């Protein structure tokens, strides 16, 4: 699996307003998100490290009580077990990378 076309993957909506395609390797998960403006996800944590990058739009992300507007050119690094939440300020396209793999997204 050296190359994957995201257009050929089945899209799922694990949270209302968050439509994703996922690519899983043995060790990592990549999530390609299309997020509707105003959609939010509640504060939560997981044992996976996470890196988030917004390709289009603006996303308000809170990590361990610190909030930042994530937009193109800004990368968010979320440590394992850190509490975080977020809200799409505008329609967004974003990428998340998780290590280790997110088994709950398989």
Each PLM stretch: what is its role?
Residues 26, 62-66, 89:
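Short strand-coil-strand connectors
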Residues 55-56, 71-72, 90:
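A cytosolic small-molecule/anion-sensing beta-strand core signal
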Residues 66-80:
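Short acidic-glycine-tyrosine-enriched beta hairpin
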Residues 31-45:
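Conserved short histidine dyad/triad with adjacent acidic residue
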Residues 49, 53-59, 64:
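Glycine- and acidic-residue-biased ligand/ion/polar-headgroup-sensing regions
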Residues 1-27, 31:
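A short, N-terminal "cap"/entry segment at the start of jelly-roll beta-barrel domains
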Residues 80-104:
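Ligand-binding loop in jelly-roll beta-barrel domains
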């Amino acid at each position: 699996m050296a190359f994957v076309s995201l257009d050929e993957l089945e899209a799922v909506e694990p949270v209302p307003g968050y439509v994703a395609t996922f690519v899983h390797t043995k060790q990592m998960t990549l999530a390609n998100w299309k997020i509707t403006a105003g959609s939010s996800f509640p504060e939560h944590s997981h044992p996976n490290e996470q890196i988030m990058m917004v390709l289009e739009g603006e996303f308000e992300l809170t990590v361990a009580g610190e909030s930042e507007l994530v937009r193109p050119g800004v990368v968010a690094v979320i440590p394992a077990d850190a509490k975080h939440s977020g809200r799409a300020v505008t329609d967004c396209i974003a990428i998340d990378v998780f290590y280790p793999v997110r088994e709950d997204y398989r």
